[in-house]
């Protein structure tokens, strides 16, 4: 074990693994690569900004301090950190990669794994919360804070453990034949483990939302039609974006596990597949703010404050620009559902699932 960790600071180890798994090493910065890197950095900056706006909205408005919005804030935080990690990953790629020590390489890839997996686990936590809120016709009892902290803490703890396993020893240093082609210092079995866990999470989210659909459809027959339509619309968007963004990355990692070294040239283009998965962090805040009118209004408020002489509703107002903003009305179905004996109503424009 000591000899394994002694290799972590070896400056030649990363190049050794890349020479073994890659047919050619891209050590020169071409124009196309520079353009692609610039585009990814701009995309990640957009991820950071929009998720930061969601976090500001949740933090500044006490109405959003309920369980559902706190989970959305946790999702926004993980997506924001994913954007930051992917910027660092991009800037430390290319010719810079071969100058990294193994511990630096593990930190680069591990940070991306931790934040992206935290985003996935946050989606699972939201699905669990929605199932508890709807299936049991009860948002939370006296254990509200405990349950929220448990779900949020568990999502980050599992993400840290999952992303930190390679630097703790589950890697292929000293065993080149066991190395991944896409991630040359990661063991293929670790890659398979990650894909399996994410696939199980996807199935769990699907199962929870199917359960929610069944509960909503089987109760309150007089309101089942509008509830079902709105719920199905939200679930279709959430699961559709999740699958579209993550399926390419899952597929390339499964192919990586199955292919012997140098036998699948498509693996050398894996960075494009991971770039697609990053879009999930870009689209998550768009989806959830679009489906919640109050959250959308609060997220856009800082942007409206920068427009001279324009109030919350976009009308020309007197006085100092950006001041004396109108208070938000409580129109969220989630908030109304807390005081009703029935499950929350999923109405267009107000729904959060």
UniProtKB/Swiss-Prot annotation:
InterPro entries per UniProt: EDG5_rcpt, GPCR_Rhodpsn, GPCR_Rhodpsn_7TM, S1P_rcpt
Any Pfam family matching the protein: 7tm_1
Phenotype when changing residue 329 to C: No effect on protein expression or S1PR2-mediated inhibition of AKT activation and B cell migration
A GO cellular component annotation in the UniProt record: glutamatergic synapse
Domain of life: Eukaryota
Outcome of mutating residue 272 to N: Decreases protein expression. No effect on S1P-mediated inhibition of AKT signaling, GC B cell growth and migration
Effect of residue 147 to C: No effect on protein expression at the cell surface. Decreases S1PR2-mediated inhibition of AKT activation and B cell migration. Loss of S1PR2-dependent inhibition of GC B cell growth
Residues lipid-modified (S-palmitoyl cysteine): 305
GO BP term (any one): G protein-coupled receptor signaling pathway
Subcellular location, principal: membrane
Localization of this protein: Cell membrane
Glycosylation: residue positions: 19
SMART domains listed in its UniProt record: 7TM_GPCR_Srsx
Membrane topology, Extracellular segments: 1-34, 96-109, 174-189, 256-271
Transmembrane residue ranges: 35-59, 67-95, 110-128, 148-173, 190-210, 234-255, 272-292
Result for mutant: residue 248 to S: Loss of protein expression
A molecular function GO annotation: sphingosine-1-phosphate receptor activity
UniProt keywords, alphabetically: Cell membrane, Deafness, Disease variant, G-protein coupled receptor, Glycoprotein, Lipoprotein, Membrane, Non-syndromic deafness, Palmitate, Receptor, Transducer, Transmembrane, Transmembrane helix
PANTHER family: G-PROTEIN COUPLED RECEPTOR (PTHR22750)
Family affiliation: Belongs to the G-protein coupled receptor 1 family.
Disease: Deafness, autosomal recessive, 68: A form of non-syndromic sensorineural hearing loss. Sensorineural deafness results from damage to the neural receptors of the inner ear, the nerve pathways to the brain, or the area of the brain that receives sound information.
Name of the protein this chain belongs to: Sphingosine 1-phosphate receptor 2
Gene name, Swiss-Prot/TrEMBL: S1PR2
